Swiss-Prot record:
Encoding gene (name): glyS
EC code(s) of this entry: 6.1.1.14
GO cellular component: cytosol
Keyword set includes Nucleotide-binding: yes
UniProt name for this protein: Glycine--tRNA ligase beta subunit
Cysteine pairs bridged by disulfides in the record: none
UniProtKB keywords: Aminoacyl-tRNA synthetase, ATP-binding, Cytoplasm, Ligase, Nucleotide-binding, Protein biosynthesis
Localization per Swiss-Prot or TrEMBL: Cytoplasm
Reactions catalysed, as given in the entry: tRNA(Gly) + glycine + ATP = glycyl-tRNA(Gly) + AMP + diphosphate
GO biological process terms, semicolon-separated: arginyl-tRNA aminoacylation; glycyl-tRNA aminoacylation
Organism: Erwinia tasmaniensis (strain DSM 17950 / CFBP 7177 / CIP 109463 / NCPPB 4357 / Et1/99)
InterPro entries named in the record: DALR_anticod-bd, Gly-tRNA-synth_bsu, Gly-tRNA-synth_heterodimer
One matching Pfam family: DALR_1
Length: 689
């Protein structure tokens, strides 16, 4: 039997575009895991995905599992037979499980005794017998948040299924998957090519679908076509298309046969802030905006249609007619909003709840205003501008534009603030208060914006924890994890002199008596320190490095970061492993000590050369390193401490810590405590593995 190509295609109704790629990738990963678990040798597993299909193609799939030797050890001979040599129930039960009698079992002799043994050669199952269950399992494990049923069947999937094709080479594998019997039928494009046709061999896929069905099933190829054609179309009109990856992925998932076209809109709409126009084009219509070389929006857009038309101009005109009312709405909202000052929207915030136990957006605004001013004072930002930005921070939520185009919150506040003549750093802060919105997003660009962004996020963290609604499992309705990480990123990357403890205390204080959770401050600080775990692990730091720093609970993020970098560098030193082990030993010794230690090491009680030498080093370093610790020069401090390795090793080799003489014993324990205190000024090195 030779290796063959395997094909599975699931033909469906239109799949969710934002989930299409992840569904296909998960399908491929699941089937690969199934094949590997079954011991089926195979080549590359390729995935294909289009709006109405998911498909996998496995190269060089073996025709059967390899034969394998099975060994099962049974009871020991003394437990397998009674005094009369009759098989015990334990032996008979084991034999039944193996499909033999006790008399048919072999015996295994070792240095430790003799046991019953079953050996057999199991013939591998044929691949076509195994595949249907593997496909069913792979589909059942797909990350589908909401399943649906169709017709009278109880079968559930992300969308109704119409065709299933399982081919191993040219052989159709009989199976019923998701309520559909496997067949050779493949469905083509809805309006072009052949509506359906038969496929004879797995190797024909996806080319036969491209040629006869007018469907480009290769997701990567389809995406590349759209990208190349859109770039060419933009260049033709002297522009550059905004091919942001998320929209490009979504558009790729919406079409089977991509055709790129260019359209225009009236230049008068360019008077509206570009963000509102782009929101409409990208969010509502799935169009690609076009910019000139200077980054200014052009009165053009590029879109992708799913059909080759004999009259493409008709399709272009249709899309222009669709987008025009949306742009006209944006123009109307922009003009009407500017008839009143941004600040005039402040009273209307009283009508909107932030959270039922925490009050209105107006109350939140007052807290943000106060906290932004407090933060600004700590970081050296303009306090007046920060409090002004805090006062205006949520006013744009009451504008017509943001009500209709919700994703323009913040940016419209900036435009309206500029129109009202507010200071530029105040206007920019209104736009940047929500940054960073996601991993890798830009941070606020000026100190006032940093103060406002921190204040907004900390107010939410303090309030939600203050009423006991912290995130649980995957549920995080107020995006507190993102808020915490955002605050940490701003403080660390901008090197701001803020302490999480005092920052949280101030945020909680501004709520007055509204908060019922007396532990809110500690819980928020611990939660935020916990977010460092995700951050530093993504940067490649080991878990034990993080635990070593967390053990000291440093609450100033910039200080936390300096400690992390110091410990990570320390681990690269040749002395690190020995000193980490020594710290662990010291920690264990001190944990078992029951006698109170001295405030300082008594030189007169030092008897051995090794303890005298170690005490001399520890005393000298205690004095030398204090400026290092005070200035946060933790890396330099650990480099100095690394020089203690030889003295520490010699101490443990030559000195009996638990001496019989009480005063000597306590003095030696005190010396070890002083040694450990030096390292603990940076991190708990004993936790390093």
């Amino acid at each position: 039997m030779t290796d063959k190509t395997f094909l599975v295609e699931i033909g469906t109704e239109e799949l969710p575009p934002k989930a299409l790629r992840s569904l296909a990738e998960s399908f491929a990963a699941n089937l690969t895991a199934e094949l590997d678990a079954a011991g089926l040798a195979h080549g590359e597993v390729s995935w294909f995905a289009a709006p109405r299909r998911l498909a996998l193609k496995v190269a060089n799939l073996s025709a059967a599992q390899p034969d394998r030797e099975v060994e099962k050890r049974g009871p020991a001979i003394q437990a397998a037979f009674d005094a009369n040599g009759v098989a015990t129930k334990a032996a008979e039960g084991w034999a039944r499980g193996c499909g033999i009698t006790v008399d048919q079992a072999e015996r295994l002799s070792t240095d430790k005794g003799e046991w019953l043994m079953y050996r057999a050669r199991v013939t591998g199952e044929r691949t076509q017998v195994l595949l249907p269950a593997m496909i069913a399992t792979s589909l059942a494990k797909l990350p589908i948040p909401k399943l649906m049923r169709w017709g009278a069947s109880e079968v559930q999937f992300v969308r109704p299924v119409h065709t299933v094709t399982l081919l191993l080479g040219d052989e159709l594998i009989p199976a019923n998957i998701l309520g559909i019997d496997s067949a050779r039928i493949i469905r083509g494009h809805r309006f072009m090519g052949e509506p359906e046709f038969t496929i004879d061999h797995a190797d024909q896929y996806p080319q036969i679908l491209l040629e006869r069905g007018k469907v480009q099933a290769d997701y990567a190829a389809r995406k590349a076509i759209i990208k190349a054609d859109a770039e060419a179309a933009a260049a033709k009109i002297g522009g550059v298309a905004d091919l942001s990856d998320s929209l490009l992925e979504e558009v790729t998932s919406l079409v089977e046969w991509p055709v790129v076209l260019t359209a225009t809109f009236e230049e008068k709409f360019l008077a509206v802030p570009a963000e509102a126009l782009v929101y409409t084009m990208k969010g509502d219509q799935k169009y690609f905006p076009v910019y000139d070389k200077a980054g200014k929006l052009l009165p053009n857009f590029i879109f992708v249609t799913n059909i080759e038309s004999k009259d493409p101009q008709q399709i272009i005109s249709g899309n222009e007619k669709v987008v025009r009312p949306r742009l006209a709405d944006a123009e109307f909202f922009f003009n009407s909003d500017r008839k009143r000052r941004l600040e005039d929207n402040l009273p209307r915030l009283e009508t909107v709840l932030f959270q039922k136990e925490l009050g209105t957006l107006r109350a939140k605004t007052d807290r943000i205003q106060a906290l932004a001013g407090w933060v600004a004072a700590q970081i050296g930002a303009d306090v007046n501008h920060a409090t002004r930005a805090g006062l205006l921070s949520k006013c744009d939520l009451m504008t017509n534009m943001v009500f209709e185009f919700t994703d323009t919150q913040g940016v419209m506040g900036m435009h309206y603030a500029r129109h009202d003549g507010e200071a530029e750093d105040v206007a920019v802060a209104l736009n940047e208060q929500y940054q960073p919105r996601f991993a890798g997003d830009e941070l606020p660009s000026n100190p006032v914006a940093c103060a406002l962004a921190i204040a907004d996020k900390m107010d939410t963290l303090a309030g939600i924890f203050g009423i006991g609604q912290h995130p649980k499992g995957d549920k995080d309705p107020f995006a507190l994890r993102r808020a915490a990480l955002g605050v940490l990123r701003i403080i660390v990357e901008k090197n701001l002199p803020l302490d999480l403890q005092t920052l949280t205390e101030e945020a909680v204080r501004l709520y007055g008596s509204k908060l019922s959770n007396a532990k809110a401050v500690d819980e928020v600080v611990d939660f935020m320190l916990g977010r460092f775990r995700t951050w530093y692990q993504e940067e490649g730091h080991s878990v034990d490095t993080l635990q070593a720093v967390l053990a000291r609970r440093p609450t100033r993020p910039a200080d936390f970061d300096a400690r992390m970098k110091a410990v990570s560098h320390f681990r690269t030193l040749e002395q690190a492993a020995s000193l980490a082990a020594a710290n662990k030993r010291v920690s264990n010794i001190l944990a078992k000590a029951t006698e109170p230690l001295n405030d300082s090491v008594q030189a007169s009680l030092l008897k051995e050369n090794e303890e005298i030498k170690l005490a001399t080093y520890v005393t000298a370093l205690s004095s030398k390193l204090q400026p290092f610790f005070a200035e946060g020069r933790y890396q330099d401090a650990l480099i100095e401490l690394a020089q203690l390795r030889e003295a520490v090793d010699n101490f443990f080799d030559k000195v009996m810590v638990n001496a019989e003489e009480k005063e000597v014993r306590i003095n030696r324990l005190t010396l070890l405590a002083k040694l450990r205190e030096l390292f603990l000024q940076v991190a708990d090195i004993s936790l390093l593995q």
